[in-house]
Design a protein with these regions (language model features):
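Glycine-enriched, solvent-exposed interface loops adjoining structured elements
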Residues: 1-172
Length: 172
């Protein structure tokens, strides 16, 4: 996490290595982790993070993304495949009605783990290396978007969009 922050701050020329927050700018320091999370979630939709969970179900059960999240501790954004039991898809693929008892083997794509006070010190990114390489541009663009005195925000945004188009959609 600190390495990414250093890359972003060096890119926008705000790095102060002696400062505990790595920058002397309190606005940037306050926004940094929220912006990192936002860009990370955006990139996870391009570079999908696959996961798997098994859930015991009964005939007639309705399972929503929230139920999968409760079982797996991850925020789901797309179910890829369900095996092991018959089911119907409802609500545009966000609700599943099970037609028999059994174990649903659910393969899904999820968002990365959020940065929190509990995991900040040991946070490890779950995105692929190519996504992590372009992430500083997305974070820098967002941090500088309201800085009208320079054009760096839009320059970084353009570069980020270009690099995003080059991402291989397969994970790692």
């Amino acid at each position: 996490l600190n390495e990414l922050k250093k890359k972003v701050l060096a890119l926008i020329e705000e790095l102060s290595p002696d400062n505990e927050n790595l920058t002397d700018d309190p606005d940037i320091s306050a926004k940094m982790e929220d912006v990192i999370t936002q860009v990370m979630f955006e990139l996870a939709r391009f570079k999908k993070i696959p996961d798997y969970v098994e859930m015991k179900v009964k005939k007639g059960d309705l399972i929503r993304f929230e139920d999968i999240a409760d079982e797996s501790d991850y925020q789901v954004y797309q179910v890829n495949l369900i095996r092991g039991v018959e089911y119907e898809t409802k609500a545009n693929g966000t609700v599943f009605k099970f037609l028999e008892d059994g174990t649903a083997e659910i393969e899904y794509f999820r968002y990365p783990t959020r940065i929190t006070d509990k995991n900040r010190a040991k946070y490890e990114f779950e995105l692929s290396d190519d996504a992590l390489e372009i992430m500083p541009y997305g974070v820098a663009a967002d941090l500088l978007k309201s800085d009208v005195s320079t054009n760096y925000g839009s320059i970084y945004a353009q570069r980020y969009e270009q690099l995003k188009q080059l991402l291989d959609p397969r994970f790692n």
